[in-house]
């Protein structure tokens, strides 16, 4: 399917893979055990297709996912996801070296609460400390970016990695910020965030989706919201700082 789409569209493209799309060959490889070996086939295929790869860690759909991963107070579960994310960054670094172009790895975790919690500050402090540990390893062939979300299904009351949390973290630590157009209030103009964030973060990663009432990922249209987003990048002279 990807090859068919690639054959119909002009220009060159990048493919963003989640860790769960590794080629595991029927072997039971848990997420804290994954290595670049599970992605060498993707790397070679992308080279043949004249495409570059980007990457994502995957915190959801796992027995240890629950409602908290990197912000989990249980050290055993938290360390499992920290190790997973560290390994994903190393895989991204190997991809970047292979394709002679930095692989951008997005970190989004589903962490949150279905109902009101009094532990908001505690969970966010744990998430901060986890990210500090993960991002401490310097890897020259990849870039990391962090993605916020308003809420998720089953986690309606509270999201640990909110826009405020990640905007502050990225600004303080000089990390790329991910803007997903489906991760904000339906009445918000995500384009308004571009000029503000660019004053404080080095680069932006854009996930351009089309939400209906929530993060529904309808097929993207060249509508006013999409047009405004890219117009703001042009006005900010920041096309070279957005991905």
Listing of model-derived features with the role each one plays in the protein:
Residues 146, 179, 206-208:
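Active-site flanking residues adjacent to catalytic metal/cofactor-binding acidic residues
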Residues 172-176, 198-204:
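Glycine-enriched alpha-helix->loop->beta-strand junction motifs that scaffold or abut catalytic
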Residues 183:
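Short, glycine/acidic-enriched loop or turn micro-motifs at the edges of active sites
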Residues 27, 118-121, 157-161, 191-192, ...:
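Short glycine/threonine-rich loop-to-helix capping motif typified by GTGT followed
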Residues 32-54, 58, 62-176:
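Active-site acidic/histidine proton-transfer and metal-coordination neighborhood
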Residues 170-173, 186-188, 192:
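Acidic, metal/ion-handling microdomains and their immediate structural contexts
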Residues 1-73, 80, 89-90, 101, ...:
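Alpha/beta catalytic barrel-like cores
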Residues 163-166, 190-194, 226-230:
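A general structural signal for well-ordered alpha-helical packing
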């Amino acid at each position: 399917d990807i090859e068919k789409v690639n054959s119909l569209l002009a220009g060159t493209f990048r493919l963003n893979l989640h860790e769960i799309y590794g080629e595991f060959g029927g072997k039971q490889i848990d997420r804290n055990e994954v290595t670049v070996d599970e992605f060498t086939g993707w790397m070679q295929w992308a080279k043949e297709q004249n495409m570059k790869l980007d990457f994502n860690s995957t915190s959801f759909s796992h027995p240890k996912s629950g409602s908290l991963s990197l912000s989990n107070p249980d050290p055993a579960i938290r360390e499992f996801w920290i190790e997973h994310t560290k390994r994903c960054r190393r895989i991204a670094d190997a991809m970047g070296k292979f394709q002679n172009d930095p692989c951008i790895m997005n970190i989004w975790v589903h962490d949150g609460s279905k109902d009101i919690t009094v532990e908001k500050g505690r969970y966010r402090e744990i998430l901060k400390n986890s990210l500090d540990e993960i991002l401490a390893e310097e890897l020259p062939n990849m870039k990391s970016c962090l993605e916020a979300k308003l809420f998720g299904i089953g986690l309606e009351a509270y999201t640990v990695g909110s826009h405020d949390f990640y905007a502050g973290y990225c600004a303080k630590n000089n990390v790329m910020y991910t803007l997903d157009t489906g991760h904000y209030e339906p009445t918000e103009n995500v384009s308004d965030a571009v000029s503000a964030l660019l004053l404080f973060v080095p680069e932006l990663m854009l996930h351009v989706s089309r939400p209906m009432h929530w993060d529904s990922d309808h097929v993207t249209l060249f509508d006013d919201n999409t047009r405004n987003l890219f117009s703001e990048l042009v006005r900010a002279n920041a096309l070279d700082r957005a991905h």
